[in-house]
Design a protein with these regions (language model features):
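Short beta-strand segments
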Residues: 15-50, 66, 78-80
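A broad, low-specificity signal for short, low-complexity segments enriched in glycine/proline
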Residues: 1, 5-9, 28-32, 39-44, ...
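A short secondary-structure junction signal
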Residues: 32, 160-163
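Conserved hydrophobic/aromatic beta-strand scaffold that supports enzyme active sites
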Residues: 32, 147-149
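Extracellular/periplasmic catalytic domains that process cell-envelope and extracellular macromolecules
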Residues: 11, 38-39, 141-142
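Short, conserved active-site entrance elements at the starts or edges of catalytic domains
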Residues: 1-30, 167-175
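Short, structured beta-strand-loop surface elements
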Residues: 51-134, 142-144, 151-156, 163
Length: 175
C-alpha cells in the first residue's frame, strides 16, 4: 500500500477515537461504532478498550472487511481495512501495552501512575518473571481486553460530505 497522505498521518497520530462500519454477524446489516485505537505509523491500527466481551469484536471476527472513518479532525477520511482478532497472549500483550501507552497520553489522564505501572509490566515480561502479585491482576485485565488488528487494504478516500457517518442506534438490550 502506498504511503498515507500527510494530513491523514497527522490525524491518525493525534487521534484517540475512530469509527468503524462493519457488518453485523447475525443480521448482516451495517453497524457503525466509535472505538479507541492506536496507529502503528504504517498501514495498521489496533482497536481495544475496556475489558469484557464486545459485539464489535464478534462482528469483525465473523465479517473482517470493515471501513474505518476518521472523526476527530478534518479533512474526513474513509479507509478500507481487514480485521483480525488477536487471541494469543504473547502476540496481544505488546499491542495492548502500546495501546494503553497511547491512551495514557490523552489530556487529563493520570499519566505518571499508568506509565510507572506499564514500565513495571514491561520489565516483568522482559525478565520472563511469573505473573505473580499485582502482575497476576494485570494479566487478568489484559486477557479480557479486546484486541483487533486492522490492516488497511485500499486507498484512503477523502469524504465528500462533512464529518464521519453517524453512529448506529443501539439495539434492544445492548449498549
Amino acid at each position: 500500500m502506498p504511503e498515507l497522505p500527510p494530513d491523514l498521518q497527522r490525524i491518525l497520530r493525534e487521534s484517540f477515537f475512530i469509527r468503524a462500519t462493519m457488518t453485523r454477524r447475525k443480521s448482516g446489516t451495517p453497524r457503525t461504532v466509535e472505538l479507541t485505537f492506536r496507529w502503528d505509523g504504517g498501514s495498521k491500527i489496533v482497536l481495544s478498550g475496556y475489558p469484557g466481551k464486545r459485539d464489535w469484536v464478534a462482528n469483525m471476527a465473523a465479517n473482517p472487511d470493515v471501513t474505518m472513518h476518521t472523526v476527530e479532525f478534518d479533512p474526513w477520511y474513509d479507509i478500507p481495512a481487514r480485521a483480525r482478532v488477536v487471541r494469543d497472549r504473547k502476540e496481544r500483550l505488546p499491542h495492548l501495552l502500546a495501546y494503553i501507552e497511547h491512551w495514557a497520553g490523552r489530556p487529563g489522564f493520570p499519566r505518571g501512575r499508568v506509565m510507572f505501572f506499564l514500565g513495571a509490566v514491561k520489565l516483568n515480561r522482559r525478565l520472563h518473571l511469573p505473573w505473580w502479585g499485582p502482575f497476576w491482576f494485570a494479566r487478568r485485565i489484559f486477557d479480557k481486553m479486546p484486541c483487533v488488528d486492522l490492516t488497511f487494504t485500499g486507498e484512503p478516500v477523502l469524504r465528500a460530505t462533512g464529518g464521519p457517518p453517524p453512529l448506529s442506534e443501539p439495539r434492544e438490550g445492548r449498549p
